[in-house]
Design a protein with these regions (language model features):
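Conserved, structured core segments of small domains
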Residues: 1-133
Length: 133
């Protein structure tokens, strides 16, 4: 069954990872190396087990656009979005034996170094996997 593991973050997390001091100091070179090593290892283990379908990181919220329908016409708003504190920072699509296994995989992200472990992770079954929930 397929599951989408969603990693969350906020603009401050992107600033931290991008080397920009803001509400919190920027990540040091050592912190960035530890984060990179963790993500390469985490994703590599999923690929090696055959459970990884796809993974992608997403750009910062300041680069996003939101579309809403107003008076029958689309209205485009460029980011950042003040009312949105938490955003999807990246995802891993996995194909594994069960919802419990997908949850165990996602829990591994909570052991990430630095700020990565603080924002939280959500696991959602892809349509068709509902019977496993």
């Amino acid at each position: 069954m397929k599951y989408l593991i969603l990693a969350y973050g906020n603009q401050q997390d992107y600033d931290y990872l991008g080397g920009k001091d803001g509400a919190a100091p920027a990540a040091t070179a050592a912190e960035m190396a530890a984060i990179d090593e963790f993500l390469v290892g985490f994703t590599g283990a999923l690929a090696e087990s055959g459970e990884l379908v796809e993974t992608q990181g997403l750009t910062a919220p300041v680069l996003a656009r939101r579309l809403d329908l107003r008076d029958g016409a689309p209205v485009v708003t460029d980011g950042p979005f003040g009312e949105t504190e938490e955003v999807i920072a990246g995802y891993w699509m996995v194909d594994c034996a069960s919802f419990d296994r997908a949850t165990d995989i996602a829990a591994g992200l909570l052991t990430a170094p630095g700020r990565l472990s603080e924002a939280g992770v959500v696991v959602r079954p892809v349509m068709g996997a509902e019977s496993d929930v």
